Structure formats: structure tokens, C-alpha cells
């Protein structure tokens, strides 16, 4: 165990052992095996109290002893029933602590893991609010406290001035004041960010320690030896955490030697194949370098791990009409955008077999829900009360039958079989929150569902508050499961298992995650692993949809819950930077760094440019949204459907795709974005897919651009696993170096309307020599081959363009 200099002065406490009786009537059998997975580094500000939910990373099984060994400088209390670990850091503690965790089951060998705590120097920010004198209470709410409206009250200092000084982690922090129960932005602070509901939050940027611009990267990999370096070179660390992450999910400290400052060598000869090594370091003042991680063996297959996936979201009804015979007659009550339009599983299979996804560089398909939906249309609860069909698939009428209008069970089986032959994995959209009122399970087991009527007599419809977060219904015809009923949870988990077995699936996209209790997700993951060997495969992927801040999203993620979720907070900043150009690249870099810090290197988060619940990127890029005539983006889609009128909007889209495909994580493409499809809010963002074979002009240029990017991503492990260091972050220009073992890539952007020449310091990651540009968009671009001399490179970028450079082949 590596402890910082200050922490090493304290003797270890006696081992804290808690026997946990965790046999729950929810889902599990008495012989459930314990599970432990890799734990990302958890950053904790000094002199604060933090609670960590260990159920994200471990599942002890029905009865096991859990042991932790905290140093005396660290107050750690573990709740035996909830596995919540409360940590209190002392004022003089900073740096890195490796906290051993061990699960001792009644039978079998113990499982050991490492929880690395990064104790960052305390940095307080002073929030002030000037009132009118009549205010009785002013509180601060934000991502840092889970948007709790009462936990952080401000103090009245004098007159009408209220204040609160609060230690916050570095990065952008969204917040609002709650004044006598009313939510308000900070009128004295001009910086804001979209809150995901059409409104704004105030935003404050908490700077990192000025000495923290240090990054670690895996420099080389040889049999039995991994070498990591620092950028800048020669950086001196005072505390170190080096952890070996083994294929079975356990982890342990491993020794790293440092023959010179900024260089670390790790003997990996004792580790099993496919193990990973993660290195983290801090300076004497507690400043943390960005950690790095590398596999000890060379990658041999580009889809053997979750981080190798490139996902394409096929929204079935809006894809290709492969069999017109299964198309229903139009419903006269329903406007065309909400009708079934003919796309089906046969059409998606045809796209597989004609090589579209292979040419596009896709290796994973996310299919929208395939469950049979009701034959008739239904009226939406909210005004103006439009009628909709179940074309989207989110009104399950059956938990076993595939929608006949999509081709039925045979069509899905044929699709997954064909996908397997063509090297594609298939991830199915799974609806676990509700069923349709005509579903047999609702008729046979009404006790499995919550009530539509609240005790006060009001309807529990779309009430997103904490009190009704897990019980509210989306529509009166969509009964909501009650997860306090063990039989209901058992039904949902066993049904998910059957879908995988029947159709040879590779994972699930999970709908409405935050509206389902945490205890269910623990049971869901455990149930899949117990009943499905494939669920323990490193390529099996559970990805969720949660519209929350990063901390809220992360609370559902870990090897004992979901593998990742869609990164909507990063999406918001990506949109404002590259589509609307209301923020600069410095904000985008800060948001990306914030995601990396909160989620961690081990987490397979999914960045995106949009999905079926969000207006298309091009609707914002072309200026159709926000629409001053109609602030509601869905209504804008009905009244003023988007259209692309400016060629520059496609250039913005291509830059966004470059950013997406060079990020860490599992990038997701929403169908049609690769062809420049536009659209405002749902359902305008769900238009039929244009025929890719007929793509011309900007659409064809964009399609070719995306295909080039995806193939580059698959060819270069630095994109998928490597360190990421921004070497230029200005308003309109941006450059990033990524490094992994012997692989190096450079990504550069010019958002401005004028050509620019960038002089970049690319060392130490990229040595002197030649680099080749892989994205040459015009004759005005730089030469294909550029030279790095004395660690510097000059690159010319046309207006609104991006470039990727890789070392020239000898």
C-alpha cells in the first residue's frame, strides 16, 4: 500500500470487519457468488466528509465478511446494511491512499480489491446572494450536493448580503440559489449552462491547482514491463498509487520503480494476461497528476472489450422498410410523424448484409425496443393531447414477443445471426419501468404495480421530485412497476436473461435508469451474472439513460451495477461549443476533464451528439433552435420543422464527430447523424433515414468523414485507452495529444471562420519525426506529412475544420 508522506506517519487502525447478511428477498438465491470489480480513483477534497456507495463496485453475496484497513488519519465508517462508506478527511491529509477491501465469503477464496482515494487540497469558493431584505432563507443547490434544496444554507452577513464558503472539486460547477423555496439563478454571475429542461443553471469554474497540469501516460509496453512517463517530462511525485487490475475483477498494489523523476517502470511478469495497470501520482503539495492506465498484453481484437465498441443506434421504425407487407394502415387520429412509417428488422438486417455498418466502421448495434406494442394509438396526457402510435417501442404489450410490424421473432433472430456473421454485436433497448395497461402481467399481477393516484387524490403523473422519483407514471396507460414487490423484480430480471439467451444478445441499453431504485440495479447485475455466463464477458455492455449531473449519473455506474451511461452533461457543453458556439473550447475541455475525473478510467461511459429524446445537432448548428417563435423544442418540431440552410452547419457537425470519435469511452451515433439528418424535438428528430446510397454533397462528405473517423478509432488504441492531454485550449482552437504504449495521435480543431496556423508543443508524448494528416478536407489544408522538430509542430487548418495526425509509417 502506497501512502502519502503525511499519511504514512499514522499507524494503521485495527482491521475493520463487518459481517454483512445480505440475503434479500428481492431476487437472489442463497448460493449467489460474491462479486468484486475494479474501482476507479475517487477524488475527495481535504477536510470534508464524503460518502461512497460500495454497492457500485462489489456484491458480497448472501453472507460475507467485508474488511477494510483505513489509516488512522482517515475516519472511515461502513454501514453494514447499505454498504455506504463514510469518509472524513483530516486537515493535513492530502495525496493518495490505497485502501484495501476484502470480501470473505463463507465458502471459497476471499476477493481483494483496492479503493484509491485522491485527497485533493481544499479550495473554497465564496457564494454570495444580495436580497431585498424580506428573505427568510437562502440555500445553495448544485451538482456538488445532489441538488439538495436545504442542505447548504447561506448565512446573512449584513443587511441584504448572504454568503456561503464551500470547498469544491476543480471543474465547472452548476448551481442555483433556493430563496424561500424558489429556485433562482445567480443574477450577479453571467456564466450559465443549460439544465436539460430548457432553463439555465448558473455556472462557476473552480480552477485546478496551478501546478496540476501534469499528466501521466503509458509510454511503452514490453513482455513483463510497462513504462509510464509524465508530461511535462521530469515531474517529481511524492506519493504514488500503482494498482494491478486482474481479469477476475480483483485488484492489488503492484510495485513501481522510478529510476528518474517522471519515469516509472512496473514489472508485470507475475500478472495474468489481460491484466491492467493503473498509475496515479501526486506532488508534495497534494496536487494530483492525471492518472493513466494500460493493459499488459497487446490488443489482438478490436471488439473484445467494452471500450472497443462504436455504437450505432438503429431506431427501428425509422430505418429501412425491408418488408412493406408488415406495414399497418395509417391511423386517422395520428399525425404522420407519430405514425408507424415502415422501418423494420428486415431492413436493418439488409443494411448489415449490404455492408453499410462495416463501411461505416460500426461494431455494435443498439436496437430500439422490439417488444410487441399495442395495435391502437393513445392520446398523450400532456397538452395539446396529441395521439401517438407505439412506433417507438416503449409501450410493451408483451415481454416475450417481438413486434409483428417489425417482422416478429423470426426477423430478430435472423438479424442477430447475420450481425454475428458480420462482426456486429447487438445491444437491445430494455424497458424496465413500466408496461402497457393491456400487458398480461398487469392484468394477472396488479399488486406488482404502484398506484396512479397519490394519497392526496392527485394523479402521480410525471412528478419527477425525489418523493415520487421511483413511482411516478409516464402516462395513465403505462402502469409503473413497484420494486418493493420482490416478485416483480424477479420477473423483470428473469425476462432480461431470457432475451439474451433467445437472441444471443451482447447487452442492454436501459431506459429511465434514475426512475428505478438503486437496489434493483444491484440485483439486476447480480442476476445476469448468476444466470448468464456471457454477462461476465468484458465485452458485454449495460449502458443506461439518466438525465442528471455527473455525480448522479455515476451513482448508478460500477461493475456491480451498470457499465456506463450516456454522458449528457458533456453533451450539453459539446452542443454549446460546436453547434451553437456560445462557449469556447476551454469550456469544452473543462467539461471533458470533469467527466474523466468523476467517472474514472475504468468506466465505459458513452459520449454522444444526440439521441431520440434530444433535438438533432444540426437543428442547433443551423440556428433553428432555440426558436424565438416557440420555446418548447417539441412544439417547435411540430410547428416549424428544421431544415439545413447553411453549408457551414455540416462543417460544425463534422468537427463534432471528430471530437466524439477521439474521446475516451464508447461513442454512440444516432441513426442519420452520419448523413446530416436534422430535426427539432421528438418526433421531428425521428425522421426516416435517407437512403445512404443516394447521399451527395454535404451529406456524402459527412458520411465519408464519419467512416474515416471510426476506422481510425479502431486502428489506434490511443483513442480507446490512452491518456488525453489538451495542449491548446483557446476560444476557437483546440489541440489534444493522446498516447498509449507505442501509439500516438494528435487532434486539432479550428472553429473560426478563418484559416489558422497553430504552433503546437507536442512533446514529450510525440517525438521528433514525421506525422501524417488523416483528415484532409480541402486543397487549402496543410501538406499530408508534417514534421515535428524540437518537440514543436506547425499545422495549418482551414475554417471550421479538424485534423488527426499519426506518426508516419517508416
Question: Across the structure, where does each feature detected by a protein language model lie?
Answer:
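A short beta-strand micro-motif common to beta-rich folds, especially ectodomain repeats
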Residues: 94-107, 115, 276-283
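C-terminal beta-strand-rich structural cap/linker in extracellular carbohydrate-active enzymes
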Residues: 174-175, 786-810
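Active-site-proximal helices and loops of the catalytic beta/alpha 8
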Residues: 424, 434, 495-497, 501, ...
